[in-house]
């Protein structure tokens, strides 16, 4: 049986919020079967919990924000991408502020944290959402689509009219039955343009942004001294973001996501449309792991 997973141990980290610039303390904790991923604002009294679900998404400008009343948690997508990539079903994410720390701008540090905590299988079947028919949302020339696929695949195309992007791959398709999330996607960093930074800061966004936690692009090229981690790092980061946004379904997916210039807002619209159209998906479990179209790294002992 493919079983649900949580963390073996509690693990902590410190970082800054990309948009707030605030110092943030992050604690990842094990959670019982069928809890899902739950964000907890531990700085509030009483503590406010926000389940990582599509219906709890509020703001989608520059990042994905979860809300519960007037309480919010910003920039959840990179951590959720790491949770999805490692098959973590249940965990509590405690935060000392309103934003998940940006770390290095990728999901890599979160993967390291989760692997350091160790993974633990739980005594319940893992539930997957299987896509049964095509579902699409569009906004102008932007598009996001689910199609049936026997596995999990993410295809994405970006279209930036900028010399740095024109010289590099702007489309990628990753089939996770044959490609490692950890090796091929998790280290792709978020990116931004120098020309936008003044505007963003004026609107209290990207206050914590720097070449330490983002790829910064100007008219001549990439400003980061160490360059890119992957030749197609820009589009790979969009795939990383999409995986995090899709995990707001609350379960791992069996199907393919196709994005063309899609962002957090359109990704969330697609999830909401899918949830409404109950004939477009089903929940499945696998008593025999060998029959499943998806496999995960074996749980390893905490280091």
UniProtKB/Swiss-Prot annotation:
Cofactor(s) of this protein: Zn(2+)
Alphabetical UniProt keywords: Hydrolase, Lipid A biosynthesis, Lipid biosynthesis, Lipid metabolism, Metal-binding, Zinc
A single GO molecular function term of this UniProt record: metal ion binding
Enzyme Commission designation: 3.5.1.108
Domain of life: Bacteria
Pfam families: LpxC (PF03331)
Catalytically driven reaction(s): a UDP-3-O-[(3R)-3-hydroxyacyl]-N-acetyl-alpha-D-glucosamine + H2O = a UDP-3-O-[(3R)-3-hydroxyacyl]-alpha-D-glucosamine + acetate
Spans through the membrane: none
Active site: 264 (proton donor)
Record bears the keyword Lipid metabolism: yes
Residues that coordinate or bind Zn(2+): 78, 237, 241
UniProt key word Zinc: yes
GO biological process: lipid A biosynthetic process
Gene Ontology CC: membrane
Pathway of action: Glycolipid biosynthesis; lipid IV(A) biosynthesis; lipid IV(A) from (3R)-3-hydroxytetradecanoyl-[acyl-carrier-protein] and UDP-N-acetyl-alpha-D-glucosamine: step 2/6
Family according to the record: Belongs to the LpxC family.
NCBIfam families on file: lpxC
The protein's role, per its UniProt record: Catalyzes the hydrolysis of UDP-3-O-myristoyl-N-acetylglucosamine to form UDP-3-O-myristoylglucosamine and acetate, the committed step in lipid A biosynthesis.
HAMAP family: LpxC (MF_00388)
Protein name as catalogued: UDP-3-O-acyl-N-acetylglucosamine deacetylase
Taxonomic lineage of the native organism: Bacteria, Pseudomonadati, Pseudomonadota, Gammaproteobacteria, Pseudomonadales
């Amino acid at each position: 049986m493919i079983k649900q997973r949580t963390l073996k141990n509690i693990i902590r980290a410190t970082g800054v919020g990309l948009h707030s610039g605030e110092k943030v303390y992050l604690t990842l904790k094990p959670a019982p079967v069928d809890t899902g991923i739950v964000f907890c604002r531990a700085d509030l009294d009483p503590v406010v919990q926000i389940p990582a679900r599509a219906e709890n998404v509020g703001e989608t400008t520059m990042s994905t924000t979860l809300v519960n009343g007037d309480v919010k948690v910003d920039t959840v997508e990179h951590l959720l991408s790491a949770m999805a990539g490692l098959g973590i079903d249940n965990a509590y994410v405690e935060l000392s502020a309103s934003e998940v720390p940006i770390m290095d701008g990728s999901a890599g540090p979160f993967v390291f944290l989760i692997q350091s905590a160790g993974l633990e299988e739980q005594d319940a079947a893992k539930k997957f959402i299987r896509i049964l028919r095509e579902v699409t949302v569009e906004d102008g020339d932007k598009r996001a689509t689910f199609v049936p696929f026997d596995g999990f695949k993410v295809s994405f195309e970006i279209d930036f009219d900028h010399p740095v992007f024109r010289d590099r791959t702007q489309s990628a398709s990753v089939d996770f039955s044959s490609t490692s999330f950890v090796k091929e996607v998790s280290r792709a960093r978020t990116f931004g343009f120098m020309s936008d930074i003044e505007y963003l800061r004026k609107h209290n966004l990207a206050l914590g942004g720097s070449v330490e936690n983002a790829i910064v692009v100007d008219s001549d090229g990439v400003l980061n001294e160490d360059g890119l981690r992957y030749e197609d790092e820009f589009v790979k980061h969009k795939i990383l973001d999409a995986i995090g946004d899709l995990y707001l379904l609350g379960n791992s997916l069996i199907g393919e996501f196709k994005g063309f210039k899609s962002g957090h807002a359109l990704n969330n619209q697609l999830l909401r449309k899918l949830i409404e159209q109950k004939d477009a998906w089903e929940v499945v479990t696998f008593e025999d792991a060998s029959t499943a179209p998806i496999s995960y790294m074996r749980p390893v002992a905490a280091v």
